[in-house]
């Protein structure tokens, strides 16, 4: 797939937002943003009869009936329906309230989560619903996310109604905007309403940034994130909610994070978040951040989970000189990224230089060389971080298989047979039968130059990690799950390299 096939400039799936309200005067849509005028259509020609014989039957033609409604109902929309028609469609039976709806009208998708409300001192149930019009092609998890946002807003409005009659007041102002002497009910209602402006601001924030964090009517806190759109805006390959949830589920203490933008919390935020962010660094793992900050590892996981789900960070492996990187295979907006890197680094180093160095794959220390001036080392380190942040580099990890030696391999020829204790360990292990004999010979040959206890330790570790040597677990995961030292486990793999096949690929959880 070429970069041209991926639209990194795509807009959000959000197309419009409407406020549906029922009250004493009936149902109506009191707000639509943005209000786009209906597209002009060519005038239709009256069908002509196929015969001059007036008695011959002519095929009937369906025509749209003029909507007789008034006020908000007579306002035309881009959806080939007036607001009155849409209000009739959106009205939900009371039994279906407090549940999401998802419908298509004229190939346009509408989602919402209607809620019921009551006027103070009355028993009649009315409805409030924030309806989102979504573009074609959005995935189900995106539609579900906007249903959740609709529910959050509606719940907030109902709560405000219970506190001080908020929706009663809005309904009264909507009735005033529909008076016969007022030709533009939407504009009239917007002059007094406390709903219209917040909905417009939310719409713009989602389209511009992909997420919302604000107080509705300066009273109720609301949060929302369209993950794929937010990542696209940050020039990162977009991921949906399901992909991000899968990453969160597989997150381990040996992972690290890279912040995608300035996420320093507001003054009223939890001070633990600020404390953790002050210890956040590309060369630190989650466990390192927990140790340095003194925050329990579980709490660190919860904060990082929040950052990932709100597209404020991506998961990486901590920077280390032995890390192996290569240029990413996913399509990238190279022209836009070149401009961004030029603005950040100027003429000191070019984007292409960083990408070219790691193709073919190389370790980090070959790029950030110790013989370079400290300033140059710092610039190159920042370049690598920027490339990782925008997922233009990916790290390759070492994976392992246990395989029978090749036919041309030089097999061990020990002078003494393998001890019975070692043979028993090998026979009771999960090692493939076709390599057990070779492993026994390797142990016997090792005893010629190494102590018995050392060989037993090496064999025991090899047998212990063998179930994970199936090509699905890389070195870091093997080391972590078995609580082993990296140098020691690498020594074990070297000792039994005759029956081990290795290969490198990305860890798709983090990439």
Curated annotation (Swiss-Prot):
Q: What does the entry give for GO biological process? A: cellular response to amino acid starvation; negative regulation of TORC1 signaling; positive regulation of autophagy
- Recorded coiled-coil stretches: none
Give one Pfam hit by family name.
HTH_NPRL3
Segments carrying the region annotation (Disordered) are 37-58
Which keywords, in A-to-Z order, does the entry hold? Answer: Lysosome, Membrane
- InterPro entries found in the cross-reference section: HTH_NPRL3 (IPR056603), Npr3 (IPR005365)
Q: How does it assemble?
A: Probably part of the GATOR complex.
Q: Write out the similarity annotation.
A: Belongs to the NPR3 family.
Question: What is the recorded name of this protein?
Answer: GATOR complex protein NPRL3
Q: Which organism is it from?
A: Caenorhabditis elegans
């Amino acid at each position: 797939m070429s970069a041209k096939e991926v639209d990194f400039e795509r807009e959000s799936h959000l197309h419009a937002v409407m406020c549906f309200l029922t009250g004493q005067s009936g149902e109506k849509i009191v707000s639509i943003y943005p209000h786009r005028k209906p597209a002009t259509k060519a005038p239709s020609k009256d069908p002509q009869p196929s015969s001059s014989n007036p008695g011959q039957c002519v095929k009937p033609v369906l025509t749209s009936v003029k909507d007789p409604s008034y006020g908000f109902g007579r306002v035309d929309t881009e959806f080939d329906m007036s607001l009155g028609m849409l209000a009739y469609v959106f009205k939900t039976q009371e039994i279906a309230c407090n549940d999401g709806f998802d419908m298509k009208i004229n190939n346009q998708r509408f989602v919402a989560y209607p809620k019921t409300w009551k006027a103070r001192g009355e028993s009649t149930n009315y409805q409030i619903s924030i309806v989102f019009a979504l573009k074609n092609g959005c995935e189900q998890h995106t539609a579900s996310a906007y249903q959740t946002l609709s529910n959050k807003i509606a719940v907030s409005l109902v709560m405000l109604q219970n506190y001080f009659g908020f929706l009663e007041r809005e309904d009264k102002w909507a009735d005033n905007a529909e008076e016969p002497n007022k030709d533009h009910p939407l504009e009239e209602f917007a002059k007094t309403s406390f709903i219209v402006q917040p909905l417009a601001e939310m719409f713009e924030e989602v389209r511009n940034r992909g997420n919302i964090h604000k107080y509705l009517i300066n009273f109720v806190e609301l949060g929302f994130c369209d993950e794929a759109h937010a990542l696209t805006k940050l020039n990162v390959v977009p991921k949906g909610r399901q992909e991000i949830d899968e990453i969160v589920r597989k997150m381990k203490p040996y992972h690290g994070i890279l912040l995608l933008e300035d996420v320093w919390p507001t003054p009223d935020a939890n001070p633990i978040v600020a404390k953790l962010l002050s210890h956040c660094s590309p060369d630190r793992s989650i466990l390192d951040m927990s140790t340095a900050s003194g925050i329990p590892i579980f709490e660190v996981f919860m904060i990082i989970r929040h950052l990932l789900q709100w597209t404020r960070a991506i998961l990486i492996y901590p920077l280390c000189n032995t890390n192996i990187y290569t240029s990413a295979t996913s399509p990238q907006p190279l022209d836009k990224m070149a401009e961004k890197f030029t603005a950040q680094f100027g003429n000191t180093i070019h984007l292409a230089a960083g990408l070219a160095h790691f193709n073919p794959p190389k370790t980090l220390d070959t790029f950030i060389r110790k013989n370079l001036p400290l300033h140059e080392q710092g610039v190159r380190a920042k370049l690598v971080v920027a490339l990782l942040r925008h997922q233009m580099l990916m790290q390759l990890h070492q994976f392992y298989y246990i395989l029978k030696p090749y036919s041309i391999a030089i097999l061990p020829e020990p002078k003494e047979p393998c001890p019975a204790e070692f043979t028993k360990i090998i026979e009771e292990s999960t090692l493939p039968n076709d390599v057990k004999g070779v492993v026994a010979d390797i142990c016997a040959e090792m005893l010629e130059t190494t102590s018995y206890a050392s060989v037993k330790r090496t064999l025991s570790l090899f047998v212990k990690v063998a179930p994970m040597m199936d090509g699905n677990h890389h070195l870091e995961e093997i080391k972590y799950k078995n609580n082993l030292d990296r140098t020691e486990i690498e020594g074990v793999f070297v000792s039994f390299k005759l029956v081990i096949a290795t290969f490198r690929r990305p860890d798709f959880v983090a990439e």
